[in-house]
């Protein structure tokens, strides 16, 4: 059997276990001939164990026969940080206005979640990446 040829890749950010075949997904998949409802069904099944509604990136590979496969990534660090400290959004002026504080322990929990998607070789390097994301949002990291 011949290997399928990938013709395009689509990147989306979709709420876990709550995807609906609406405009956002339809507009992204429609031009490639992919069935929106079929993707939504498979995506919701695969993300059922995640926190419902948390936004997760997904990379969809569309093949020449109009079939598809997809990879679900971990939620963005900013969303995990906001959820952990209970804020709606980061600071507009992160260098002067602080919106909250996060402990090193909580940040390490986020690092462990994000580790598969980061290009860091060690947890200490990943910690620096995630703490930088927190600081750029105006969240202070406890020393």
Curated annotation (Swiss-Prot):
Keywords from the named record: Methylation, Ribonucleoprotein, Ribosomal protein, RNA-binding, rRNA-binding
Pfam families: Ribosomal_L11, Ribosomal_L11_N
Organism domain of life: Bacteria
GO cellular component, as recorded: cytosolic large ribosomal subunit
Example of a GO biological process term: translation
Changes after translation: One or more lysine residues are methylated.
InterPro entries named among the record's database cross-references: Ribosomal_uL11, Ribosomal_uL11_bac-typ, Ribosomal_uL11_C, Ribosomal_uL11_C_sf, Ribosomal_uL11_CS, Ribosomal_uL11_N, Ribosomal_uL11_N_sf
CDD domains from the UniProt entry: Ribosomal_L11 (cd00349)
Keyword Transmembrane helix: no
Record GO terms (molecular function): large ribosomal subunit rRNA binding; structural constituent of ribosome
Binding partners and assembly: Part of the ribosomal stalk of the 50S ribosomal subunit. Interacts with L10 and the large rRNA to form the base of the stalk. L10 forms an elongated spine to which L12 dimers bind in a sequential fashion forming a multimeric L10(L12)X complex.
Similarity-based family: Belongs to the universal ribosomal protein uL11 family.
Function as written in the Swiss-Prot or TrEMBL entry: Forms part of the ribosomal stalk which helps the ribosome interact with GTP-bound translation factors.
NCBIfam families reported in the protein's UniProt record: L11_bact
Name of the featured protein: Large ribosomal subunit protein uL11
Source species: Borrelia garinii subsp. bavariensis (strain ATCC BAA-2496 / DSM 23469 / PBi)
Gene name in the database record: rplK
